[in-house]
């Protein structure tokens, strides 16, 4: 019935359902279908800039046999071409160095106790030739004081999770900072190499990369120090 609306000379019988009032009700998902209705109203294909659901829209148009819309989609895709994912390289290196920190803890009005705790500092270097993937990695991680001015294909991070034994004031005095990931309202601390590389792996797979090498132990992915991803 919907396809008939686009074909001149096709008789349209009224809806005989008493609840329809002589009109037709179209119950479809609005994600792509609203563009079909816009095409019906305007007589032209008017899609947002960068619209990436043309395959879904074409499937809907084919289902309803809307030939003018199918023709318009073919013209659009021919003008755009079909961009294939470009070849790219992603390399993630993580290094950790332990540090013994001494601090004094107040145990009473005139009682101070000297304590020590190990603090692990992590340094990560991400190299990616795909700017979109690198941007996603930058957005994935957050630190308190971060310089994002670094350009090119590199992205470097340094963080040190605070041990429970180390007071917050001493942690800040030492100039240490945590690293977190996740939504702004629900941040999760990145406590070490495995959790950091897990997030890198997620982003890499989301952008079409595949794992190419693991160092030093190929059998122990998340406890490695270096991951290399490629996209052909």
UniProtKB/Swiss-Prot annotation:
Pathway: Protein modification; protein ubiquitination. GO terms for biological process: positive regulation of neuron differentiation; protein homooligomerization; protein ubiquitination. It comes from the Eukaryota. Residues 1-49 form the BTB domain. GO terms for molecular function: transferase activity. The keyword Cell cycle applies. Keywords: Cell cycle, Developmental protein, Growth regulation, Transferase, Tumor suppressor, Ubl conjugation pathway. Homopentamer. Interacts with KCTD6 and KCTD21; KCTD11 and KCTD6 or KCTD21 may associate in pentameric assemblies. Component of the BCR(KCTD11) E3 ubiquitin ligase complex, at least composed of CUL3 and KCTD11 and RBX1. Interacts (via BTB domain) with CUL3; initially a 4:4 stoichiometry has been reported, however, electron microscopy revealed pentameric states of the BTB domain. Plays a role as a marker and a regulator of neuronal differentiation; Up-regulated by a variety of neurogenic signals, such as retinoic acid, epidermal growth factor/EGF and NGFB/nerve growth factor. Induces apoptosis, growth arrest and the expression of cyclin-dependent kinase inhibitor CDKN1B. Plays a role as a tumor repressor and inhibits cell growth and tumorigenicity of medulloblastoma (MDB). Acts as a probable substrate-specific adapter for a BCR (BTB-CUL3-RBX1) E3 ubiquitin-protein ligase complex towards HDAC1. When BTB domain is deleted, growth-suppressing properties are lost. This is BTB/POZ domain-containing protein KCTD11. It comes from Bos taurus. The gene is KCTD11.
């Amino acid at each position: 019935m919907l396809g008939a609306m686009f074909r001149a000379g096709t008789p349209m019988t009224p809806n005989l359902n008493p609840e329809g009032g002589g009109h037709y009700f179209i119950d479809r998902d609005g994600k792509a279908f609203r563009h079909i209705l816009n095409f019906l109203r305007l007589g032209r294909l008017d899609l947002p800039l960068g619209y990436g659901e043309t395959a879904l829209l074409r499937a809907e148009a084919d289902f309803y046999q809307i030939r003018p819309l199918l023709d318009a989609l073919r013209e659009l895709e021919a003008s755009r071409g079909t961009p294939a994912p470009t070849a790219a390289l992603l390399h993630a290196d993580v290094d950790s160095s332990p540090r013994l920190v001494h601090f004094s803890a107040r145990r009473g009005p005139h009682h101070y106790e000297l304590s020590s705790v190990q603090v692990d500092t992590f340094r990560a270097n991400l190299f990616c030739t795909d700017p979109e993937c690198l941007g996603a990695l930058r957005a994935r991680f957050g630190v308190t004081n971060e310089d994002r001015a670094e350009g090119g294909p590199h992205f470097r991070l340094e963080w040190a999770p605070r041990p429970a034994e180390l007071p917050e004031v001493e942690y800040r005095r030492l100039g240490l900072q945590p690293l977190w990931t996740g939504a702004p309202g629900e941040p999760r601390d990145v406590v070490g190499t495995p959790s950091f590389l897990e997030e890198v792996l997620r982003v890499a797979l989301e952008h079409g990369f595949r794992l190419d090498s693991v160092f030093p132990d190929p059998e122990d992915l998340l406890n490695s120090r270096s991951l290399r991803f490629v996209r052909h």
